[in-house]
Amino acid sequence: MISIVLVSHSQKITEGLQEMIVEMVGDTVHIISSGGTGDGRLGTNALMIADNIATCTNSEHIYIFCDIGSAILSAETALELLDTELLEKTTIIDAPLVEGAFTAAVQSLVNPSKEAILQELTNVH
């Protein structure tokens, strides 16, 4: 199984996207909402993102999709907090949040290999 971590300044955005992806692919992909600061405010929280990634220990690959600049910085900071095993299987993806996460989830149903997912994401703009 793969995991997809959704990072946005808005919890509502990541929860809505999580709902949409789960509706399409079911529970075959572990989708995690990491939007907002964790206390209902807009913003990002690197500690929360790292804690959410830590729930993915059973995943073969973990992909992080972010919305805008500082969300990417928070995701990068979260990676610095991970142990080596989790870090080695975690990738921040340079793709649009909605289209990228959706494409990765659907592609994982066809071919869950990291190479296949990354290749399919090259078509997402």
UniProtKB/Swiss-Prot annotation:
It is found in: Cytoplasm. It catalyses: dihydroxyacetone + phosphoenolpyruvate = dihydroxyacetone phosphate + pyruvate. It comes from the Bacteria. The active site is at residue 9. InterPro entries: DhaM, DhaM_N, PTS_EIIA_man-typ, PTS_EIIA_man-typ_sf. The keyword Metal-binding does not apply. Transmembrane segments: none annotated. It is an enzyme of class 2 (transferase). Keywords: Cytoplasm, Glycerol metabolism, Kinase, Phosphotransferase system, Transferase. Its EC number is 2.7.1.121. The keyword Transferase applies. Residues 1-125 form the PTS EIIA type-4 domain. GO terms for molecular function: phosphoenolpyruvate-glycerone phosphotransferase activity. GO terms for biological process: glycerol catabolic process; phosphoenolpyruvate-dependent sugar phosphotransferase system. Induction: Repressed by GolR. GO terms for cellular component: cytoplasm; membrane. Unlike the carbohydrate-specific transporters of the PTS, the complex DhaKML has no transport activity. Belongs to the PEP-utilizing enzyme family. Component of the dihydroxyacetone kinase complex, which is responsible for the phosphoenolpyruvate (PEP)-dependent phosphorylation of dihydroxyacetone. DhaM serves as the phosphoryl donor. Is phosphorylated by phosphoenolpyruvate in an EI- and HPr-dependent reaction, and a phosphorelay system on histidine residues finally leads to phosphoryl transfer to DhaL and dihydroxyacetone. Homodimer. The dihydroxyacetone kinase complex is composed of a homodimer of DhaM, a homodimer of DhaK and the subunit DhaL. The EIIA type-4 domain is phosphorylated by phospho-HPr on a histidyl residue. Then, it transfers the phosphoryl group to the EIIB type-4 domain. This is PEP-dependent dihydroxyacetone kinase 2, phosphoryl donor subunit DhaM. The lineage of its organism: Bacteria, Bacillati, Bacillota, Bacilli, Bacillales.
